[in-house]
A protein has these predicted regions:
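Ferredoxin-like alpha/beta domains used as RNA- or RNAP-binding modules
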Residues: 2-17, 36-138
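Short beta-strands and strand-coil junctions in structured, solvent-facing domains, enriched
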Residues: 29-30, 52
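Residues located in well-ordered beta-strands
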Residues: 32-34
């Protein structure tokens, strides 16, 4: 591998060192981490120093592979992972992805208060009325 940190998209989401994963189970659920080492066919060593995920062994059933990868030597220490993560701009690439935006939107909707849900309902009614009016006019 080259020594450069390049974020690239792959056609196939392979389990590889440097692949960014989204943890879906456990105390770090919803956070990003990077694969540092492949232990066996069902477990990997992940580390997410920039996102608060401690270095740990993770079952591949408990993480989701993202399309993001960056150059990372096998078995890298946490400090190396942190440097490569920031130099590759992984957090920015993730924030710009539609997947991250969808998760943020889902969290925002779940956190709405009763009054905010009422406002959303009223806005949907107004939009529906405007569309119905435009269709009837055409």
């Amino acid at each position: 591998m080259s020594s450069e940190s390049i974020v690239k998209n792959s056609q196939w989401r392979l389990v590889e060192v440097g692949r960014v994963v989204l943890v879906k189970k456990g105390p770090s659920a919803g956070k990003l981490a990077a694969i540092v080492e492949i232990i066996d066919q069902s477990r990997v060593l992940i580390d997410g120093p920039e996102t608060g995920v401690p270095r740990q062994s993770a079952n591949l059933g408990h993480v989701v592979l993202t399309p993001l990868t960056f150059a990372l030597p096998r078995g890298s220490r946490t400090s190396v992972v942190a440097k490569k993560w920031t130099s590759a701009g992984v957090a920015e690439k993730w924030a710009a992805s539609s997947w991250a935006k969808k998760i943020a939107q889902r969290e925002r909707r779940a956190a709405l208060s009763d009054f905010e849900r009422f406002q959303v309902m009223v806005l949907k009614k107004q939009k529906r009325y405007a569309v119905k009016k435009a269709v009837a006019k055409a």
